[in-house]
Amino acid sequence: MLSGWLRACALVMVGMVSASALAVDKPHTAIVVGGGLAGLTAAYELQSKGWQVTLLEAKPAVGGRSGLAGSEWIGNAKAQPLLNQYIDRFKIKAVPAPEFVRTPSYLIEGEYFTGADLATKQPATADAIKRYEAALDDMARSITDPNNPAANSTLFALDQITVSNWLDRLSLPPTARQLINQQIRTRYDEPSRLSLLYLAQQSRVNRDVDDRDRRAARLPGGSAVLAEEFVKQLKVIKTNSPVSAINQDKDGVTVKVGSVGYEAEYVVMAVPLRALSKIQMTPALDAQRLGAIKSTNYGWHDQIMLKFKTPVWDSKARMSGEIYSNTGLGMLWIEPALKGGANVVINLAGDNARIMQAFGDKQLVDQVLIRMQAFYPQARGAFTGYELRRSSIDPSSGGAYLAFGPGQISKYWRLWERPLQRVAFAGEHTDTLYPGTLEGALRSGQRAATQVQGLSEGKSYEPVKAPPPKAPEPVKESNGGIGGFFSNLFGGSKAEPKPAEKAPEVAPAPAPAPAPVTPPPAPVVEPAKPAVTEPAKKAPAKKEPAKKEPAKKEPAKKAAAKPAATHKAPAKTDAAKKAPAKPPADKAATPAASAPASDSKN
């Protein structure tokens, strides 16, 4: 009897051990919504960690918003480290780029110019472009941490200014302004819709990356080849599966596709920002995220590939690579002629794309052909066909990729790096350093996978309160370039001479005579646009004898302080933005081995 009882106990113990072993061995589950490169990366990384992953894609095929031709040309490891890591891991062969496609060139009134040609034939235009680049570099240098671009109130104020407004102040000659506008709208969006702080932050990220680094090799087949390699690794992919709802509870998440419900512990949302508004989420997104979905600016980009029997442009000009036009042709990408034929990819961007949205595909192509015909009379006769990619009118994306407008970094910076309970977010729009690029999509997928892993281990990604932006640092005034830039930007170009004129007023008194020499730091207050009387009253202001003087300055300072006020208004949102200061740290865990880089979309 005793032996029977012992046998029963042993069986119970074996059963308990087996059950606990099964519990330990049972893999975590996740659903990835969106089959662009961000979603594919997140699914691949989670599956590599032993997770059971299901990827749902609304369209008939995965791959996302990769371009027609630009995505074939990729940067080197300096420009796109993570992309190059995956290319090496999957043993994809890239072909070194010919030298003549590695630097941009120009098409001015139908005439082709390399950078060297421009310097000799149109020196005024070339000098103006250099002046613009130097001014932009001054701004970029003033951002010490591109992950926190609005680190002080002066930089924060740049977010309230459009790029177009800043370019107006540079007084560029017309042709140079047209070419610069075209470059900015091609890479981001229309200058009048773009935050100056965003342009400065992106320039800071790519400050040490040369144009030659961006076009270092060709990936035959483009980003679709990389997408295919991810697909080969993944076990469960369901296309034609548009998600309509996501419901979370304490035990997991249910994702609805029509009448079918998929269940998992966690979800990665890797869809374009606008597509989020079409998915009902329970619990619902907070007001700040809903505002971001509705108002965050997306760059408008349409790509038209025109096919010709033979090159219709001047055969003496070796036109190939990225060519910026000062006319309505936008940015041209001319493929090297193959088998006697020639392809031209024309990128219509910004407002050039917006005004074409009412046109059908054939009408749009005809409009572009009319413009080409004006410069190249053989164009229509040699034309054989076309391909189109119109991201701007795609309802699922609402544009090509993120391009922060004025005031939007202040409101939405790093907002999507914070998970919503069991849902993490990925996509080019969630990456701080390389939004709108292949590199940004890959980085965001890695970061989301790391966050989901962290959530399963009990890690929290709730925001932590961050200090408000620091006041602008006077020290930078001594650095000629930066001080001069901010001085001019906020109307201080006249403020510097004025203190000099005031100096004589104080000079009559022998004791204060040295004081006029000390005022040089005074121009640091130039954002306040001091009145003519200010320099004389500055000394009293420091001793605080009369508080009326500060009262007079107050109205002027309020103008400059307004951004700071608006910055404080969304106190919680600021916390939310800076909160991801921790998630990025986690993000660095997996991506750490790989730095950021750039080239197409998610």
Question: PLM features: residue spans?
Answer:
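Beta1/beta-strand and adjacent pyrophosphate-binding region of the FAD-binding site
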Residues: 24-38
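Core beta-strand elements of the Rossmann-like FAD/NAD(P) dinucleotide-binding domain
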Residues: 28, 257-266
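Conserved flavin/dinucleotide-binding core of flavoenzymes
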Residues: 41, 252, 300, 316-496, ...
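Glycine-rich FAD pyrophosphate-binding loop
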Residues: 47-68
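Dinucleotide-binding Rossmann-like beta1-alpha1 core, especially the glycine-rich loop
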Residues: 69-138
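Active-site/ligand-binding neighborhood in enzyme catalytic cores
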Residues: 144-242, 249-252, 261, 270, ...
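Flavin (primarily FAD) binding-site architecture
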Residues: 269-287
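Compositionally biased, proline/threonine/alanine/serine-rich low-complexity intrinsically disordered stretches
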Residues: 461-602
